[in-house]
From Swiss-Prot:
Record's keyword annotation contains Oxidoreductase: no
Recorded GO MF terms: hormone activity
Annotated family: Belongs to the insulin family.
Annotated protein name in UniProt: Molluscan insulin-related peptide 2
Keywords: Cleavage on pair of basic residues, Cytoplasmic vesicle, Disulfide bond, Pyrrolidone carboxylic acid, Signal
Modified residues (Pyrrolidone carboxylic acid): 32, 113
Propeptide residue range(s): 71-83, 86-110
Disulphide bridges, residue numbers: 47-123, 59-136, 122-127
Pfam families hit by this protein: Insulin
CDD domains: IlGF_insulin_bombyxin_like
SUPFAM superfamilies noted in UniProt: Insulin-like
Subunit structure comment from the entry: Heterodimer of a B chain and an A chain linked by two disulfide bonds.
Taxonomic path: Eukaryota, Metazoa, Spiralia, Lophotrochozoa, Mollusca
Organism of origin: Lymnaea stagnalis (Great pond snail)
Length: 137
């Protein structure tokens, strides 16, 4: 009877340890959210104009400037900043004759750092006002 009890106890301990280990491995760190291209909005997440309004409300209570939405019509490329290419002047470009192998060219590319943003933290995950306050500036 003691032998059976000991086996059951060991199996129980192993099961508990594996469960705890898997629970620790799967959970993201406290206060950090992760998003990917396949992420979907959280059932209690705040998205779109609701998120912008929530952020403006939280930040206005901290005497911080509210977020200004970028005008889609003007965008970032203003007509006066665009330059039409000229075939004659492009021939004088000192970088024109630089040739690199694919391997060499790829060494100049760096992997983007994975960062979380307000949409990731509050739309695709559940967030609190304290999380939103981190995005007040």
């Amino acid at each position: 009877m003691v032998g059976v009890r000991l086996v059951f106890t060991n199996a129980f301990v192993v099961t508990v340890l594996l469960t705890l280990l898997l629970d620790v491995v799967v959970k993201p760190a406290e206060g950090q959210s992760s998003c990917s291209l396949s992420s979907r909005p959280h059932p209690r997440g705040i998205c779109g104009s609701n998120l912008a309004g929530f952020r403006a409300f939280i930040c206005s209570n901290q005497n911080s400037p509210s977020m200004v939405k970028r005008d889609a019509e003007t965008g970032w490329l203003l007509p006066e900043t665009m330059v039409k290419r000229n075939a004659e002047t492009d021939l004088d470009d000192p970088l024109r004759n630089i040739k690199l192998s694919s391997e060499s060219a790829l060494t100049y590319l760096t992997k983007r750092q994975r960062t979380t943003n307000l949409v990731c933290e509050c739309c695709f995950n559940y967030c609190t006002p304290d999380v939103v306050r981190k995005y007040c500036y």
